[in-house]
Structures are given as structure tokens and as C-alpha cells.
Amino acid sequence: MASGRDPREERPGGLEIWDLSREPWDEWLRDMVEEINNEAKLHFGRELLYQVWNYCQEEGERQGRPIAERAYKYYRLVQKALFVHFRCGCRRRQPFEPYEERRNGQGGGRPGRVPPGLD
């Protein structure tokens, strides 16, 4: 410590670590939500993903949060669900079929809001 400097390295800022300045946050988030939806619809089915999306949107509206923050919450929830699903041992060999979503011939209607990548 002869030079008077702290020998520990300084912590880099968030943008230095992730370098998000090169791509707008909204565009990055939209791409990530579409990618995770492409994987999630093979394992969970669209109806469940619609319900999670609508939950995030309605909860965010109640709390006055921006749309990007609501989409990020959806992304985190689906990512955690996929992690647990794979951790428990996914045995699915085929993509999720629409008829599997309907129990005893009863299926829900399509909700008003659809997450990106599930159109």
C-alpha cells in the first residue's frame, strides 16, 4: 500500500459487465422472451403460458410497472419453471400437443393478450 491505492480491483458497472449499450433493452428482452417461449411451448402447452403471461401483465398493471418489467417477470418465471422441469427429469419426447391441453373435451378460449413468440 505504498502507492496509497487499494489493492483490490474496483467493481465494474452493470453496463460494463453485460455491455447492453450495444442493443436496446426492449429488443433484447423481446428476443429472449420469444426464444424461451419456443422452448417452453414444447414442454408446458400454450394455455399455461397464456395464463402466466396474463398474470404478469395484470399484476404489473395493478402496481403501475412498465411493460418491459412485466415481460421480464414473465421471462424469469418461465425460465425458473423450465429449470425445475428439466431438473426433475423431462421425459417428453414429442412436442406438447393441443389435445393434451384439453381435459375431457374442455379447453379454455384464447386470451386477449398473447406473449411474444406464441402467436
From Swiss-Prot:
Pfam families registered for this protein in UniProt: VPR
Keywords, alphabetical: Host nucleus, Host-virus interaction, Inhibition of host innate immune response by virus, Viral immunoevasion, Virion
Record's function text: Plays a role in nuclear translocation of the viral pre-integration complex (PIC), thus is required for the virus to infect non-dividing cells. Targets specific host proteins for degradation by the 26S proteasome. Acts by associating with the cellular CUL4A-DDB1 E3 ligase complex through direct interaction with host VPRPB/DCAF-1. This change in the E3 ligase substrate specificity results in the degradation of host SAMHD1. In turn, SAMHD1 depletion allows viral replication in host myeloid cells by preventing SAMHD1-mediated hydrolysis of intracellular dNTPs necessary for reverse transcription.
Span list, region Disordered: 98-119
BP-aspect Gene Ontology terms: symbiont-mediated suppression of host innate immune response; viral life cycle
Family the UniProt entry places it in: Belongs to the lentivirus VPX protein family.
InterPro entries, alphabetized: Lentiviral_Vpx_assoc_factor (IPR053711), RetroV_VpR/X (IPR000012)
GO annotations of cellular component type: host cell nucleus; virion component
UniProt lineage: Viruses, Riboviria, Pararnavirae, Artverviricota, Revtraviricetes
Localisation per UniProt entry: Virion; Host nucleus
Binding partners and assembly: Interacts with the P6 region of unprocessed GAG. Interacts with host VPRBP/DCAF1, leading to change substrate specificity of the CUL4A-DDB1 E3 ligase complex.
Name assigned to this protein: Protein Vpx
Miscellaneous: The 155 isolate is from a monkey imported from Kenya.
Superkingdom in the source lineage: Viruses
